[in-house]
Amino acid sequence: MPEKIIELFTDGGCRGNPGIGAWGVWLRLAGQERVLWGFVPETTNNRMELTAALRGLEALKRPSAVRVISDSRYLRDGMTQWLAGWQRRGWRTAGGDAVKNRDIWELLAAVAARHQVQWEWVRGHSGHIENERVDALLNRVMDQYAAGGQAREGEGWL
């Protein structure tokens, strides 16, 4: 029997860059769905994209086969093309600059190593149902916080 694949649809966003930001995860396995979200009062879009993937993978209780589907090429390319070189060069880019968001990249690399992860990119705002849903989720989180909400992170089953 083939192993079931967990799907993590992730997105991060920011109003202003830097500015208020949020991340969201739509997790799906065998017909069950769960959402995770969080808010950060001062951040960047890229940090929220990375945080969404990190929190989604951290939510998995045991090593799993996972598809991480994101509209962030920064996330996908970082994990599939750039990470090994950054590590080899002491967290420097090919141009010699310090890698931005190194703190999250290091955490993400460590948690991803526990799983078999496929990193997939989808075009944002193109009608991809799950990407649109997770984008709407993180925008609701930013709206609620802007309206005086206090929760920084949350989750729920659908």
From Swiss-Prot:
Per the record, the major location class is cytoplasm
Task: Relay the cofactor remark from the entry.
Answer: Binds 1 Mg(2+) ion per subunit. May bind a second metal ion at a regulatory site, or after substrate binding.
**Molecular function terms from GO:** magnesium ion binding; nucleic acid binding; RNA-DNA hybrid ribonuclease activity
UniProt cofactor(s): Mg(2+)
Question: According to its UniProt record, where is this protein located?
Answer: Cytoplasm
Q: Which residues does the annotation say bind Mg(2+) 2?
A: D11, D135
Give residues annotated as binding Mg(2+) 1.
Answer: D11, E49, D71
Q: Could you tell me the keywords of this UniProt record?
A: Cytoplasm, Endonuclease, Hydrolase, Magnesium, Metal-binding, Nuclease
- InterPro entries documented for this protein: RNase_H, RNaseH-like_sf, RNaseH_domain, RNaseH_sf, RNaseHI
Reaction(s) catalysed (UniProt annotation): Endonucleolytic cleavage to 5'-phosphomonoester
Q: GO CC: one term?
A: cytoplasm
EC number from the UniProt entry: 3.1.26.4
Which is a GO BP term held by this UniProt record? Answer: DNA replication, removal of RNA primer
Which is an annotated Pfam family here?
RNase_H
Q: Which residues form the RNase H type-1 domain?
A: 2-143
- Describe, as the record does, how this protein assembles with itself and its partners: Monomer.
Instruction: Tell me the protein family, please.
Output: Belongs to the RNase H family.
What role does this protein play?
Endonuclease that specifically degrades the RNA of RNA-DNA hybrids.
Protein name per Swiss-Prot or TrEMBL: Ribonuclease H
> Which organism is this entry from?
Acidithiobacillus ferrooxidans (strain ATCC 23270 / DSM 14882 / CIP 104768 / NCIMB 8455)
**Lineage summary:** Bacteria, Pseudomonadati, Pseudomonadota, Acidithiobacillia, Acidithiobacillales
Q: Which gene encodes it?
A: rnhA
